[in-house]
Amino acid sequence: MSTPSIVIASARTAVGSFNGAFANTPAHELGATVISAVLERAGVAAGEVNEVILGQVLPAGEGQNPARQAAMKAGVPQEATAWGMNQLCGSGLRAVALGMQQIATGDASIIVAGGMESMSMAPHCAHLAGGVKMGDFKMIDTMIKDGLTDAFYGYHMGTTAENVAKQWQLSRDEQDAFAVASQNKAEAAQKDGRFKDEIVPFIVKGRKGDITVDADEYIRHGATLDSMAKLRPAFDKEGTVTAGNASGLNDGAAAALLMSEAEASRRGIQPLGRIVSWATVGVDPKVMGTGPIPASRKALERAGWKIGDLDLVEANEAFAAQACAVNKDLGWDPSIVNVNGGAIAIGHPIGASGARILNTLLFEMKRRGARKGLATLCIGGGMGVAMCIESL
């Protein structure tokens, strides 16, 4: 499936820890920052953007259409539209696919697409329209309810990871080893400055002065198997999934500027890469973490590629269990997967992660001179999404 859509520029904020650096920063402010960054990196004026599409899973309490808020805060004129979409963890990558489709149909020539999320600012709420005459009432944690709980079986995403671990016979040791490797790779990448080009600094204003956030704060330096082994199972007393071999609760944003090949050629712009294909596929919600398996196969088929053609892969690490299952089933070379660590180390701001891994993939492909790459994520509710990228 060939399209005329190419990625001209990409950027992300650092990923913040839960109640960390971005604890009081609304998602649309993070989104505005990455929109501004990709416009600057591409040399495109805000007034030239046709539309902004941003994934977000937890918009409750942020006001009408946070994507529109982000766009206008970034200087995109009111004549250009903006909207948000929600495909849970796949939102950021699906937003890019939607932007690609807008360009492919001729409805737009320049799109900014990506994702943003503040898990820290997701509110607790209660339905009080009917009134509470007396006694206590229940508050709902919207982050847990809307972002992390399976709507069909009523259990946490961590339980779906336990299901995958059992089905794929993945031991605690295997999951912990995967998680430690992710942390160690991310630590090495951070110390080596490999994330600096993709991260745009964000200034957090405070009473004691401004703080510039320009480095991922969730990465655990010095992670070891011994420290990982001390953690208790988080979702099943007899289980294998822990806080250490699962991704975190995080805040962040990422975006890409998409343009038609004709428009890029007219402007004389050298793109980061071309979107060759994409796919999204449904699976059993009980094992939602396996979604990248059929989604990746379908995206590769549409691209006319084979797994062996891939130079780099960014496969989101919602849980070590599902990441190990994906790696085993697809059989790709593990040395090309998440070479700078994944979400277990960097973090998983759910609505932004799809754009974050695409961003990381594009910059690492450029750094290595890699030709073909694939980005993929599992999605709550039983889905997967994948995208094939080719350098130009």
UniProtKB/Swiss-Prot annotation:
The active site is at C89, H348, C378. InterPro entries: Thiolase (IPR002155), Thiolase-like (IPR016039), Thiolase_acyl_enz_int_AS (IPR020615), Thiolase_AS (IPR020610), Thiolase_C (IPR020617), Thiolase_CS (IPR020613), Thiolase_N (IPR020616). PROSITE patterns: THIOLASE_1 (PS00098), THIOLASE_2 (PS00737), THIOLASE_3 (PS00099). One of its GO terms (cellular component) is cytoplasm. One of its GO terms (biological process) is poly-hydroxybutyrate biosynthetic process. It catalyses: 2 acetyl-CoA = acetoacetyl-CoA + CoA. GO terms for molecular function: acetyl-CoA C-acetyltransferase activity. Its main location: cytoplasm. It is found in: Cytoplasm. Pathway: Biopolymer metabolism; poly-(R)-3-hydroxybutanoate biosynthesis; Metabolic intermediate biosynthesis; (R)-mevalonate biosynthesis; (R)-mevalonate from acetyl-CoA: step 1/3. It comes from the Bacteria. Keywords: Acyltransferase, Cytoplasm, PHB biosynthesis, Transferase. Changing C378G: Loss of activity. Pfam families: Thiolase_C (PF02803), Thiolase_N (PF00108). SUPFAM superfamilies: Thiolase-like (SSF53901). Its EC number is 2.3.1.9. Homotetramer. This is Acetyl-CoA acetyltransferase.
